[in-house]
Amino acid sequence: MPKKILIDFEKIKDPYSGLGQFCSHLKFYFDQSQLNLNYWIPGKWQKLAKKCHHFLPKSAVFHAVHQDSPYLPNFKKTKYILTIHDLNALYEQTQFGSGDYYKKKLQHKIDHASVITFISEFTKEEVRRHFKVDLLKTKVIYNGISLGEHSTPPPKIPTKPFLFSVGTILPKKNFHVLIDFLKQIPDYQLIVAGTTFHSYAAEMQKRIEEEGLTDRFFLVGTIDEPQKLWYYQNASAFIFPSLLEGFGLPVAEAMSLGLPLFLSDKTSLPEIGGPDAYYFKNFEPDYMRDVFLTGMQDFSIEKKNRLKERSKMFDWKQAASRYLELYENI
C-alpha cells in the first residue's frame, strides 16, 4: 500500500487569504496526483486538541504548509515537512516582548523537520539569520500566479491614468507613503485594493481627506479576482512600497501582465521583481516622483516582454510538482 501523506490544508477555509490561496492552488494540482494524499481540514472539536499529535490521523509524511501551523505529528513515526513563508510574526511579536517564545516554538519545528521549504531565497536567508538550520534539508519553492482569464469592471473606475496596488492595508505595507507621493504626480490617480479592518486604513483615509486627494486616491477595499485582473489590465503601472514580504505575490501578478513595477527595495521584493523593476531606496516624496517619472520614460516593450517571461518562474503547477516530488522521495 502506498505511503499515506497528510497535508495541513486548514487555511483553505479562508480562500481570500494568502495562505488560503496557497492551499487552494496546490490542492487543485494535488487532486490530479496518484499519490496517497490526505488533507487535514479539522472541524471545531478537533481544534480543541490541536496541540496533541495523537489527534492527527496516522501518516508516513505530514506537511505543515506554513510556519504557524499548530499541528505536529509524532516525530518518531512520521516524516515532517515544514514550509516557511516569512518571519513577520517574529518581528511583530518581538515588538510586544514575546519574540523569544515564538523563536523557541519555531526552532522546535525546524529541529524536527526532515525537509524545510521556503517561498523565497530571502526567507531562507532570514531564517538562517535567526535560527539554527541544517542547509542540507532546505529547498526554495516559489509560489505561483493564477489570475484567471476573464476580468470584470470594478465598482470604482478611475477617470485618469492610474497606478494600482493591492494588499491588506497594514502598517507593514507602507501604503501611507503613497499619499505624499501622489501629490507629486497630479496627472495620475491611485487605486489601493485590500482589506481595511486595521486602524491604519482609517488613518490613511483621514489623511487622504485632509490632503484633498479624495478624487485621486481610492482605498477600494476587498475586490474579487476578475476585478483585480481589470485593474492590472488597465493600470499605467504597479506600485508596491511594502516593508515586509516573504514573497510578494502581487508583484508577480503585475509582472505577468508586463506592467512597469515600482517597488520597495526591501526584503524579498528585489528577488521577485528582478532587474527590470524600478526600486525605491527611500520614501521621500520627491525622490519617489523622480524614480517613477524616470522609470515611466525608460520603460520599453523589451522590458515589458522580459517581465512577462520572468513571471513564468512563478507557476502553481510547477510548485505542486516539486512538493509532490518531495512527498514521493522523502
Kindly give the residue locations of the regions a language model identified:
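Carbohydrate transferase catalytic cores enriched for Leloir-type hexosyltransferases
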Residues: 1-330
